[in-house]
């Protein structure tokens, strides 16, 4: 099993798809990595030679992925909250940041509905 950036890549998948299991690498980045390293995207992860795995590892070493990327994103959000920007306030309140309406919907960001009991008349 190929282990790259601390992640065990699934053996049966194509390398192109297997690399996307690493946080911070999507399909376009995966394709670029394989193009630069000269690895065939249709190769299965289990069929990679040690030389190919090392060339992929060396390329990914220069990218910000996994823990470093997660930390960077968390610090960016923390900075927004600390400076009190609009986006930081929305993060703090757990609301959508990018101008979506919140009268209805926005349930993913707001969480389950908090129902209010009707008053007796």
Curated annotation (Swiss-Prot):
PROSITE patterns: RIBOSOMAL_S13_1, RIBOSOMAL_S13_2. It holds the Pfam family Ribosomal_S13. One of its GO terms (molecular function) is tRNA binding. Part of the 30S ribosomal subunit. Forms a loose heterodimer with protein S19. Forms two bridges to the 50S subunit in the 70S ribosome. Located at the top of the head of the 30S subunit, it contacts several helices of the 16S rRNA. In the 70S ribosome it contacts the 23S rRNA (bridge B1a) and protein L5 of the 50S subunit (bridge B1b), connecting the 2 subunits; these bridges are implicated in subunit movement. Contacts the tRNAs in the A and P-sites. NCBIfam families: uS13_bact. This is Small ribosomal subunit protein uS13. It comes from Clostridium perfringens (strain 13 / Type A).
């Amino acid at each position: 099993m190929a282990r790259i950036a601390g992640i065990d890549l699934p053996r049966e998948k194509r390398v192109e798809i297997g690399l996307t299991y690493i946080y911070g690498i999507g399909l376009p980045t995966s394709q670029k990595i394989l193009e630069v390293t000269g690895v065939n995207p249709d190769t299965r992860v289990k069929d990679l030679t040690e030389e190919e795995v090392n060339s992929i590892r060396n390329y990914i070493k220069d990218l910000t992925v996994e823990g470093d990327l997660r930390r960077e994103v968390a610090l960016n959000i923390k900075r927004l909250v600390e400076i009190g920007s609009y986006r930081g306030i929305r993060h703090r309140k757990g609301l959508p940041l990018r101008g979506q309406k919140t009268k209805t919907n926005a349930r993913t960001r707001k969480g389950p509905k908090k129902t209010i009991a009707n008053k007796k008349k």
